[in-house]
Curated annotation (Swiss-Prot):
Name assigned to this protein: Nonribosomal peptide synthetase 9
Molecular function GO labels: ligase activity; phosphopantetheine binding
Stated role: Nonribosomal peptide synthetase; part of the Fg3_54/C64 gene cluster that mediates the biosynthesis of the octapeptide fusaoctaxin A, a virulence factor that is required for cell-to-cell invasiveness of plant host. The 2 nonribosomal peptide synthetases NRPS9 and NRPS5 form an assembly line which likely utilizes GABA as a starter unit (loaded on the unique module M1 of NRPS9) and sequentially incorporates seven extender units composed of the residues L-Ala, L-allo-Ile, L-Ser, L-Val, L-Ser, L-Leu and L-Leu, respectively.
Region called Adenylation (A) domain, residue ranges: 202-591
GO biological process: amino acid activation for nonribosomal peptide biosynthetic process; secondary metabolite biosynthetic process
Amino acid sequence: MAPLNTYTSTEVLLLDNACNDVHELGRALWSITVDRYHHRDEWTLTCLAEAHGRWDMTYRLVSIQNATTIGQLLAAERLVESPKDASDEDNIFAFATTGSRLPVRTLLGRSSFILQLSEFDGRPTAQVLFSGANNKGQARILLNVFHSLWETHGSSPLNAERPVCEVGGLSYEDVRILELVNSGRLAQQQECIHDVVLQHALQAPTQHAVRAWDGNLTYHQLNDHADRIATMLVSAGIGPGDFIPSIMEKSYWTIVVILATLKAGAVFVPIDPKCPASRINGIFLQVWPKVYFTNLGPQMRRKLNPSVACVDNFAEIVQQVQPGPLPPSRPDAIATCFFTSGSTGKPKGAIHDHSAIATGIVDLLGPFHMDSRTSSMHFVSPSFDVSVTEIAATLYAGGCICVPSEQGKLNDLNGQMRALGVTHAFLTPSVACQVKPSEVPTLQYIMLGGEPLGRATLEALCEDVHLINVYGSTESGLWDTASERLTLQSKPSNIGRSTGPRMWIVHPGNPGNLLPFGTVGEVMVESHCLARGYIGNQPAKTGFVPAPEWRHQLFPGMEQGRFYLTGDLGSYNPDGSIMLHGRKDTQAKIRGQRIELGEIEHQFKAALPTSRVVAEVVTIGSRTMLAAFVELSTAEDKTDIEPSVCVDSLSIRTAQAARLGATPALSAALPVYMVPEMYIPVNSIPLTMSGKTDRRRLRELASTITTVQLEMINGVDDEKEQPRNERERLIQATWAAVLQRKASTIGIHDHFFKIGGDSLSAMKVVAAARSRQLVINVGDILGHPTIASLAEFLSSSSTISYATKGMANRDIQVTVTVL
């Protein structure tokens, strides 16, 4: 704990005399200030009052929700003793009152901020005391916000019925700075991506547009193939406004059908081919397609709606159909519909017009250093919005899209990137940490997004390749912000400055309340790049909002775009970049893929109607995963139960029974990345003071799970049979290196995915095994997830040779040698 003499003070501000009780007003406004600094569901305010040279210390439990009033805030429960969870908070916030400049002689511990309210010449004064040299900027922001609130509300009586979320306090300086950081013009491109591709085909017909595992296409070939398939669509009665789903594994044909759909005037609807058939059919019911594209086998097709025609004979169409008249381009027409997880249990489709996509692309070409020399890797499924950047932005720039095979990117990511000549890659930090720039000499830029950036990834790559931290949402279509080149001194949560949109920070419960510069609030995007909304105008929980009143009143000279509330909490840094602080709702991301935890819990209620199960993304050790917390207690009143993870045999059996009961139903309704990997038994689901699920506490509980407890929960055998031969010892050593544990703690019958492994760590195993002259692939691990079974499989396998279509339209022999 830090004694007071390590504290530093901000300047002292002289406040106007208030018509309210000074101490009561100060505590209320300081509580609001702190809430806008971190936006926790509940926290502890340490209150210090001086009398006769001595200090009295009490505590207030503060919980500010959307409906919380000033009166409720002032009546916050007072405690004489510190709550048991007070020491768990990231920062200590205190409010001190004294009749003089008497210093606060107390120990508050850790990083602390104390608002000291004093008096000078009959007028109140305020200063913020803070510990830690790095907290000066935050302390000044806190003092400025408090001062703005005092100036706005101190001269009139406090309205006890007024909701806290309506309490504003912008200073003239805040307005000036916000206008400065958002002063750029909102551009709007009136063009279509397929028209830009046509221009490239005319001006540079022989330049590579696609370099894929199954073949290459020049811009002339790409445009010609797309024209022929679009002509077929038009002749089949497909026209403007028709939705065409595409359920395809990555291939150069994937790029062709995207352009063909747009040229026909239709709407491209990408669907992940790994989705269960029930989810695909559910999307069909929302878009009512006449046809869909696929390159999947007949087994999947038989499960889909038979009334929708299937188009899969792309090569035959290109050979037999001559290009014909196509509908005129309309930049205001809908171009794409990306489906994402919905909180009501039903996926929702965000629709973008051509102009929005083109506008977003033009905004980011400069920050991402993309031009005709760009070779961008198409890594993600086309169903994810990142693919717009990978595909559309690359084509707009006149560059080349590099398409690795699915198995190739899993088993030899660096080799695939090297063979394709990749210069740009858009990756999640989890995947990026597997990239070795020394093995990919062409690689220049990696854009990191989709999940929080960790310092390990930053340190591993920033000196060898140009790293850019990026941020955006499905509703934005592309990226909203991008950082400068990351260095070892960069903060991973800094997402950089706007690439074009205006970025506003508003109150999480009231977008009509623009927050002071530097405080934490919900990130709101204003742009012409935004989606028009969701298909079917789904009104529930939409983030699309009309222009707030402050937008016209404070910034009347700025042209206006559309507005979207992201649900992300952020704050402005002094240089105009933005720092992220988590989410305000139940939306989460796992390995770059957006999920609504509410949609998963909706399925749990149907599958396990008598159980309470909460889904949450947690981190255990170095691994982030989607977990299901299974509540064991059936008591009505659980207030006296201290939530904890239960690892006794009965609790574990109960959680495993929940897994067995729910997994089939979840797997049939949700994509595989939305099915929990782990079921954690807890005696009680923790709640906040307001009665909501305390997700922060759940994440903390999960973080305390040890390796031994993890294996107990996953049903891993205590007995660890050790390797019997050299091959098993090699595999054990490889697993141990990747999972960061002692080799002796892994038995030959332990299941890889129950001892901390996942698909990403399986990719790492493949790479690590290669350095040990052991050649395996991810499919081998999936099919043989124990050391014993994998070693036996490798022993029984012979040398396999197969042909695949190479990077230059020639057959390449690939040999897998089994040691």
